[in-house]
A protein has these predicted regions:
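Conserved small-residue-rich beta-alpha loop and adjacent elements
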Residues: 67-142
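Generic structural signal for well-ordered, non-membrane alpha-helical segments
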Residues: 1, 28-46, 87, 102, ...
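Alpha-helix capping at helix-to-loop junctions
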Residues: 48-55, 96, 118, 146, ...
Length: 241
């Protein structure tokens, strides 16, 4: 990863892995209060939504040794002596790919990281490309601390996907990789999900962003522009109309 990061991102690093706590005092000072507050509000909103998804619609406190005491389990007796159950189990380890080539995306970090945190994933690996000076955006570091990420992989592209899929001496192997990226990231995700040696799943192959906004004279121009920019910032191949 070090050689690919130097070759492709033109950043020289001594290590590609950072461990918590991720924010230094300099990182904290680099974030203004309004940005911190906006991230806190977004975190609370995303968390409240995914917290509501945890429990099944109809639950019964578990009485079986296979589940934790008091765990909510949906149980249905289909016929005498036959009980079917449904109960949630978190994926053991997940890899979150957060793009960073064209924009700082703490929003992506939240959308990927909060569900993993709420679900109870034991290992959360966040991969994001470093900036030209080798640093990671303070906003992304702040989110990584909030979601209690296991580590940050300071690398992007196919090499980051490969590191999470197969594992390295410093990067934990994950069971599932989620998150958007460019065509190289998408191709890498599709390749590793079909690799027997990787034994990793992905969320989906994410294509280039595109959006069509239909607006009339009553539309608020600032809102329309914001909707367009939110997609256009994803990359040079994004299409906004």
């Amino acid at each position: 990863m070090l050689s690919f990061t130097a070759q492709l991102d033109r950043v020289q690093l001594d290590s590609t892995v950072r461990l918590p706590p991720f924010q230094t005092e300099a990182d904290k000072q680099a974030m203004d209060a309004r940005t911190r507050e906006a991230i806190d509000v977004a975190y609370a909103n995303v968390r409240s939504f995914h917290e509501a998804q945890k429990a099944p619609a109809k639950t019964t406190p578990s009485k079986h040794a296979a589940w934790a005491p008091g765990e909510d389990v949906m149980e249905v007796t289909t016929m005498p002596g036959v009980v079917c159950t449904r109960f949630p189990r978190a994926i053991e380890s997940v890899g979150l790919y957060v793009p960073g080539g064209s924009a700082v995306l703490p929003s992506t970090s939240l959308m990927l990281g909060v569900p993993a945190q709420v679900a109870g994933c034991k290992t959360i690996v966040l991969a994001t490309p470093p900036r030209s000076d080798g640093s990671i955006a303070p906003e992304v570091l702040y989110v990584a601390d909030k979601i209690q990420a296991t580590c940050i992989v300071c690398a992007g592209g196919a090499q980051a996907v490969g590191a999470m899929a197969y594992g390295t001496q410093s990067v934990p192997k994950v069971d599932k990789i989620v998150g958007p990226g460019n065509q190289y990231v998408t191709a890498a995700k599709m390749l590793v999900q079909n690799e027997v040696d990787a034994l990793v799943s992905i969320d989906m192959p994410a294509g280039p962003s595109e959006v069509l906004v239909v607006a009339d004279a009553s539309a608020e121009p600032v809102f329309v522009a914001s909707d367009l920019l939110s997609q256009a910032e994803h990359g040079p191949d994004s299409q906004v109309v």
